[in-house]
């Protein structure tokens, strides 16, 4: 299997399966001298960790990360950073019934068609369990971006099923189990999710991630545009079915006179571009939004076929998220941070000496 590495200069390779003994990652290209400890990575892992609320999967994993290499006396050495998280709460017996039948909406069928073999225990490599390592690796990128460049990356839930959510208070995001920046709507979310659980069903969601403080010029046209690489990174997250930057699909309804982000001596007048023009960052907030499908791991009976091609019923057992979008917030943050980190190193390698005659202009008022 290839395709397990992301990045050009700041690379992350992950390994491991949902019910294997452990998950791991190799982070290569991190500059030396960055103060780094396991505690620096644990905060975001705890935000993603399963079993932290009644609205997510009840699989109990401590997700304690270990740094195996690349750090000496509390600082990165410039060598590959090895990360490891042990799996401790596998219940593989829950998946015995699907060993020879395909769950609709999952990768069971496609993995078997491609490889001729599949790990049916919790989806194996295709499980979102793999994203724990992305969050750990993303913690390294986030720390570097924040401390060396002043770049911050923050996400929140902006829609859960029919409930649209505003971004009213970023400080409230970590104070509720939904990563919601619209705290007045939290009771509505709780009520909706309780009804959903009773029905044994699932729901989709949307997550918005905003990166602030990005310097202008990040991106490599034409095929490694910043927006293209952000879309690539975000689409690699399990269950993501769509990615927007800035106004996104709403651009279809805008006139050019509205959509263009006019430049003034005081700064950009708007940010419909989402902080990227011509594949390069503008210095404005980089604003991304992802749509996540509802998981098909539900107890509502459905139809499928077995490995012999015969029709069989399917009811998913095991422990699953009724809305995968909730725990996707720290995952999406990590993927944005990893992309920005890689592009910063690439920009620095080629354009460190560039001094444009026009200084950067301020971002639009948020």
UniProtKB/Swiss-Prot annotation:
BP GO terms, sorted: amino acid biosynthetic process; aromatic amino acid family biosynthetic process; chorismate biosynthetic process
Primary role: This reaction introduces a second double bond into the aromatic ring system.
Residues given in the record as FMN binding sites: 125-127, 238-239, 278, 293-297, 319
SUPFAM superfamilies membership: Chorismate synthase, AroC
GO MF, one example: FMN binding
Source organism per UniProt: Alkalilimnicola ehrlichii (strain ATCC BAA-1101 / DSM 17681 / MLHE-1)
Protein's name according to its UniProt entry: Chorismate synthase
Entries under Pfam families matching the protein: Chorismate_synt (PF01264)
Cofactor note as given: Reduced FMN (FMNH(2)).
CDD domains: Chorismate_synthase (cd07304)
Pathway: Metabolic intermediate biosynthesis; chorismate biosynthesis; chorismate from D-erythrose 4-phosphate and phosphoenolpyruvate: step 7/7
Name of the gene this protein is made from: aroC
GO cellular component, one term: cytosol
